[in-house]
Amino acid sequence: MEYATMSSSNSTHNFQRKIALIGARNVGKTTLTVRFVESRFVESYYPTIENEFTRIIPYKSHDCTLEILDTAGQDEVSLLNIKSLTGVRGIILCYSIINRASFDLIPILWDKLVDQLGKDNLPVILVGTKADLGRSTKGVKRCVTKAEGEKLASTIGSQDKRNQAAFIECSAELDYNVEETFMLLLKQMERVEGTLGLDAENNNKCSIM
């Protein structure tokens, strides 16, 4: 299943970035992405093999074509699809705030990324999904505090503190911090890359090869 939508702005200079969402099964990676790309909430859960999405967003007077790779749910022993990750410039690590195991898996996934890609300086953000359930009256208990998420984020990324992961919580159902999640990653990418390669001649640098 693939989704694609494009929204234009009055920007005159374009650039392109590929990012990937990585996390355990059923943490809401696809739901988050569909909310961002199509502005709708997908309630049913269908295990993802791999999906690709595209959205054009305005960023600092430019049009950014954001290619979003929604990866299959991971566990301790699964291997990442390195071929699919070719060209990825930023990573969104996802866990559910109502699923402790998905949170505990994050350091394992990050180490797996570093080992398989051979680099730890990729722009990365840590995202706690399903924030609406943690504060609802549906009888669902929050299993991971915001403070725990912030602490974990501080341990992810390269040894250069400027490249440490940023942290945010979001809810696809309530459309809470969804746009902000992807913009936060763009800011992380800009910080690492310098200018985000807005000049056409720099547009294809700094990718995973």
From Swiss-Prot:
<keyword id="KW-1003">Cell membrane</keyword>
<feature type="binding site">
    <location>
        <position position="31"/>
    </location>
    <ligand>
        <name>GTP</name>
    </ligand>
</feature>
<keyword id="KW-0378">Hydrolase</keyword>
<comment type="subunit">
    <text>Interacts with BTN2.</text>
</comment>
<feature type="lipid moiety-binding region" description="S-farnesyl cysteine">
    <location>
        <position position="206"/>
    </location>
</feature>
<comment type="function">
    <text>Binds GTP and exhibits intrinsic GTPase activity. Involved in the regulation of arginine and lysine uptake. Acts through the CAN1 permease.</text>
</comment>
<feature type="binding site">
    <location>
        <position position="45"/>
    </location>
    <ligand>
        <name>GTP</name>
    </ligand>
</feature>
<feature type="binding site">
    <location>
        <position position="30"/>
    </location>
    <ligand>
        <name>GTP</name>
    </ligand>
</feature>
<feature type="binding site">
    <location>
        <position position="132"/>
    </location>
    <ligand>
        <name>GTP</name>
    </ligand>
</feature>
<dbReference type="GO" id="GO:0005886">
    <property type="term" value="C:plasma membrane"/>
</dbReference>
<dbReference type="InterPro" id="IPR027417">
    <property type="entry name" value="P-loop_NTPase"/>
</dbReference>
<dbReference type="GO" id="GO:0005525">
    <property type="term" value="F:GTP binding"/>
</dbReference>
<dbReference type="Pfam" id="PF00071">
    <property type="entry name" value="Ras"/>
</dbReference>
<keyword id="KW-0460">Magnesium</keyword>
<feature type="short sequence motif" description="Effector region">
    <location>
        <begin position="45"/>
        <end position="53"/>
    </location>
</feature>
<feature type="modified residue" description="N-acetylmethionine">
    <location>
        <position position="1"/>
    </location>
</feature>
<dbReference type="GO" id="GO:0046872">
    <property type="term" value="F:metal ion binding"/>
</dbReference>
<keyword id="KW-0636">Prenylation</keyword>
<protein>
    <recommendedName>
        <fullName>GTP-binding protein RHB1</fullName>
        <ecNumber>3.6.5.-</ecNumber>
    </recommendedName>
</protein>
<dbReference type="InterPro" id="IPR020849">
    <property type="entry name" value="Small_GTPase_Ras-type"/>
</dbReference>
<dbReference type="GO" id="GO:0003924">
    <property type="term" value="F:GTPase activity"/>
</dbReference>
<feature type="binding site">
    <location>
        <position position="28"/>
    </location>
    <ligand>
        <name>GTP</name>
    </ligand>
</feature>
<feature type="binding site">
    <location>
        <position position="42"/>
    </location>
    <ligand>
        <name>GTP</name>
    </ligand>
</feature>
<keyword id="KW-0342">GTP-binding</keyword>
<feature type="binding site">
    <location>
        <position position="48"/>
    </location>
    <ligand>
        <name>Mg(2+)</name>
    </ligand>
</feature>
<keyword id="KW-0007">Acetylation</keyword>
<feature type="propeptide" description="Removed in mature form">
    <location>
        <begin position="207"/>
        <end position="209"/>
    </location>
</feature>
<comment type="similarity">
    <text>Belongs to the small GTPase superfamily. Rheb family.</text>
</comment>
<feature type="binding site">
    <location>
        <position position="48"/>
    </location>
    <ligand>
        <name>GTP</name>
    </ligand>
</feature>
<dbReference type="GO" id="GO:0042147">
    <property type="term" value="P:retrograde transport, endosome to Golgi"/>
</dbReference>
<keyword id="KW-0449">Lipoprotein</keyword>
<keyword id="KW-0488">Methylation</keyword>
<feature type="binding site">
    <location>
        <position position="29"/>
    </location>
    <ligand>
        <name>GTP</name>
    </ligand>
</feature>
<dbReference type="InterPro" id="IPR005225">
    <property type="entry name" value="Small_GTP-bd"/>
</dbReference>
<dbReference type="GO" id="GO:0005829">
    <property type="term" value="C:cytosol"/>
</dbReference>
<feature type="modified residue" description="Cysteine methyl ester">
    <location>
        <position position="206"/>
    </location>
</feature>
<dbReference type="GO" id="GO:0019003">
    <property type="term" value="F:GDP binding"/>
</dbReference>
<feature type="binding site">
    <location>
        <position position="30"/>
    </location>
    <ligand>
        <name>Mg(2+)</name>
    </ligand>
</feature>
<keyword id="KW-0472">Membrane</keyword>
<dbReference type="InterPro" id="IPR001806">
    <property type="entry name" value="Small_GTPase"/>
</dbReference>
<keyword id="KW-0547">Nucleotide-binding</keyword>
<keyword id="KW-0479">Metal-binding</keyword>
